[in-house]
Amino acid sequence: MTTQPATPTALDGLWEPVRIGSVQALNRIYLPAHQVSLPPPAYGAYLAERARGGVGLIVTHGFHVHPASARAGVSPWEPAWADAVRAFVTPSKRLGVPVIVQVTHMGASGTRRTDDIAHWGAVLAPSQLASPVHRAMPQPMEEDDIRAVIEGFAATCANVQAGGGDGVEIHGSHGYLLSNFLSLIHISEPTRQEAI
């Protein structure tokens, strides 16, 4: 019995490998960032199941780069967080699927419970304009705050690299801090130009 070769389809290209910078994805199907609240080993198992299911590239949910955006006691800017990264990226990488880690600062879209304020401090944003969704009143950022957030992005990205992540995706939409700085609603034009 002979088998006939499969008839080519318009979707065949989806299964071809693709290079994005230095990252080689197995195919053109990727798992986008979405929130899953699991500890690192369980999150790693969750992502690996998606790798087994056929995705060629994984983007994790967002990890916060600074205390003013932090939640749930996770401190990605601290060097010890590299071990957590290793725990959730390694299972997928063993299957040949690269993992990109999303990093973010929520800015005016941040939320705070009373215990969060005591532990992490106030929500920070370019101006004192609350998000229409979360309604937490942000504290306007000073230059030192901006510098600290930049350092938080750098430290978190370094931890991703140290933990074996294949890259980072910076999330700046949805009213988060980076989009706050680009919005004329949140800041004046001279301030926006200084920020850029």
Annotate each language-model stretch with its function.
Residues 47, 89, 157, 165-168:
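Generic hydrophobic/aromatic pocket-lining and core-packing "Φ" positions
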Residues 2-106, 138, 149:
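N-terminal capping/small domains of soluble enzymes
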Residues 58-61, 99-103, 163-177:
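Short beta-strand segments at enzyme active-site cores
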Residues 137, 182-183:
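Active-site-adjacent beta->alpha loops and helix N-cap segments on the catalytic face
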Residues 104-165:
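Non-globular sequence segments
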Residues 67-69, 111-112, 177-181:
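Short acidic/His/Gly/Ser-rich catalytic and metal-binding motifs that mark active-site loops
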Residues 185-196:
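Single conserved hydrophobic/aromatic residue that forms the stacking wall/gate
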Residues 93-97, 157-165, 190:
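Secondary-structure transition into beta-strands, especially the periplasmic turns and strand N-termini
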